[in-house]
Amino acid sequence: MNNCSYPKFRITEENPCEAVRVNVYGTRLVADAAVKYGVEKFVMISTDKAVNPTNIMGCSKRLAEIYVQSLSLAIIKGEVQGCTKFITTRFGNVLGSNGSVIPRFREQINNGGPVTVTHPEIIRYFMTIPEACRLVLEAGTMGNGGEIFVFDMGQPVKIADLARRMIELSGMKVGKDIEIEYTGLRPGEKLYEELLSHKENTKETLHEKIRIADVREYNYQDVTKCINLLSNFSLNVEIVDMVRKMKSFVPEFKSQNSEFEKLDKL
């Protein structure tokens, strides 16, 4: 089970080289070790931010998805010696996890406010920790190797409504006892997240909350060359060249409200 990554887009947008070293090259090291030592199944935890990424974190997780899937297909085709089955799970925010909005809102309410929301229209998908764990384990059990499993996250939640509801449940009134302050979208932040790109379709599984994304297949050797190049760029802190390469390999990566937007115009 691989859940090691820098998951916060704010940190990775400011430290893109670390994002590539940990999220991309780190995943490759762990995946290669799994093959070397004959691990039966390798389950990678991905994110909805990997879909049509608008920030470094999302693109780095998409590259990690691409690597493990290409490695799995290379094993199936006999191009790489091994028996490990690689399975990817992709889902959104987990309620109550470190850095999630609910603990932050609770702290802000306890301190008398204001409760900060980046944009009045921003929406996110949520699931509970037990539900996320259960679906990851079930996807890992049903996977045969090379799949990207997408979870049914239910209806998206408007973050402003969540903030308002938490304030009311605390016995206070918005605008009277406590304010909601809109701070503006941060670099790389989307108004809404997607679980699938417009180029992906899904296939049903026997589980009503789990589907398989039908994604483009990448050649393992091409992916390996790309990751080697990205790793060298990151070690030498050649940020512009590194991000440019990320955008060329994942062409749907379009930066938003970020210093890297200029690379989309070249």
Residue ranges and their predicted role:
Residues K36, I66, S70-L266:
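Strand-loop microenvironment adjacent to phosphate/nucleotide-handling motifs in alpha/beta enzyme folds
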Residues M1-R21:
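NAD(P)H-binding glycine-rich loop region in Rossmannoid oxidoreductase-like domains
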Residues K8-R10, D48, P53:
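Helix N-cap/beta-alpha junction loops of NAD(P)-dependent oxidoreductase domains
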Residues A31-D32:
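A short, exposed helix-loop element centered on a Lys and neighboring polar residues
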Residues S60:
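Active-site helix of classical SDR
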Residues N2-C4, F42-T47, T89-F91:
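SDR active-site strand-loop-helix element
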